[in-house]
């Protein structure tokens, strides 16, 4: 799916970010990308911060024995932003990691934001450290990074949550939208592929159906 838009696989040693509102298909794209990495003989780390990952959905999209696939998937389900940091640190000890996925990178971060400046400063430092560790471990393992992100309101409509930090360190940024049963991916930022290209697709029970690719 993403290789159609990026004109190649998810780039290694950099962050690819997909952002959009809830229910548009971000997790489905993560699962498809995960299965692609496993097909290439790699293990995948999946950090699920929102409880979105479904074993049944993995089975539907793969059409294979899920028990066998799960041997290649290391799943973490942190319940706090600190636990998310701890999960990232564990990746340094793993072998043959081809892809690191964080589904909902700032979900726990946003839940813990409060009116106390000191606490928010601590959270911001933790987010910066997580990005640093992500990039460090991806370079060590020669792996790709795929993160999903929520949205927030802005003057121009919606924009990714997480501020300038995530925007700066994400070398690929993809927006996902939904209109009835049709989803649209738009490439907003990339070092090599053509920015502005978009891909329309449908989510089916057993996969994703590409409708067309165009430039806007």
UniProtKB/Swiss-Prot annotation:
Cross-referenced Pfam families: Rad51
Transmembrane segments: none
UniProt keywords, alphabetically: ATP-binding, DNA damage, DNA recombination, DNA-binding, Nucleotide-binding
Stretches assigned to coiled coil: none
Positions that bind ATP: 20-27
Any one biological process term the GO annotation gives: DNA repair
Database matches in InterPro entries: AAA+_ATPase, DNA_recomb/repair_Rad51_C, DNA_repair_and_recomb_RadB, P-loop_NTPase, RecA_ATP-bd
UniProt xrefs under Gene3D superfamilies: P-loop containing nucleotide triphosphate hydrolases
GO MF term set: ATP binding; ATP hydrolysis activity; ATP-dependent DNA damage sensor activity; damaged DNA binding
Family of this protein: Belongs to the eukaryotic RecA-like protein family. RadB subfamily.
Main function: Involved in DNA repair and in homologous recombination. May regulate the cleavage reactions of the branch-structured DNA. Has a very weak ATPase activity that is not stimulated by DNA. Binds DNA but does not promote DNA strands exchange.
Protein's name according to its UniProt entry: DNA repair and recombination protein RadB
Organism: Methanococcus maripaludis (strain DSM 14266 / JCM 13030 / NBRC 101832 / S2 / LL)
